Amino acid sequence: MTKEKNQVSVLFMLFSILFCVCLITANVLETKQISVGKISLTGGLIVFPVSYIINDCVCEVWGYQKARLLIWVGFAMNFFFVALGALCDAIPGAPYWNNEAGFHAIFGLAPRIAAASFVAFLVGSFINAYVMSKMKLLDNGRHFSARAILSTVFGESADSLIFFPLALGGVVPALELPKLMLWQVVLKTGYEIIVLPLTIRIVGYLKRHEGEDVYDNGICYNVLKIFNL
């Protein structure tokens, strides 16, 4: 392998940074409830699906192993942000500062919700990357659009099935949880479909610029093999 091949791709680094920013931003936006018509959703819906689109692009161009590294880096940065926010929230505010309640609403995530969010993110993201990788091998690199959509459906479904029962079970009425989960999956998948033409162009550009189009033949899919690149 040449020295150039050992160098880290600048575009991969930029995608990694954007991925982490999306995850951290989604955490903050999740604290606001929004309405789309008559449907109540969390503000994280605005940006969180972008992380799945980035995951698709990375897995398609650089392969599952780079996507695995990206997911763990995103998880670590997100955890670091949440931990620092919780630490600052636990420190008493200055006597003259009147925004304690607002700060706590954003950074005082209940441990149950934070844990559910982290577990759901890891499971959903790895399923998304795994499905994307395996379908590319089965389709011999064809049908990117179908692979991107189906991997998102599987990933987002797993994310919702884990997050909502763990975080909101006993808080939201049992009959409402399935509706909430379904709408999250439908809208997040719809988000991906709407931006799919742009995603296709980005993937095409990345493959040409990077000279990469990785097929994951014979790799280890163990999610803990972080540095097995």
Where are these regions (language model features)?
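Helix-boundary and loop/linker segments of multi-pass membrane transporters
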Residues: K5-V8, G102-F107, L137-R142, G170-A174
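Hydrophobic transmembrane alpha-helical segments of multi-pass transport and channel proteins
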Residues: V153, S157, V185-P197
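Short, highly charged, low-complexity non-transmembrane loops/tails of multi-pass membrane proteins
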Residues: V203-L229
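Membrane-interface interhelical connector segments
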Residues: C88-R112
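Transmembrane alpha-helix/helix-exit interface in multi-pass inner-membrane proteins
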Residues: N78-Y96, S117, F121, S125
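Hydrophobic transmembrane alpha-helices
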Residues: M1-F75, F79
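Internal alpha-helical transmembrane segments of multi-pass membrane proteins
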Residues: L138-S157
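A structural feature that tracks compact, well-ordered secondary-structure segments
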Residues: T152, L161-G169
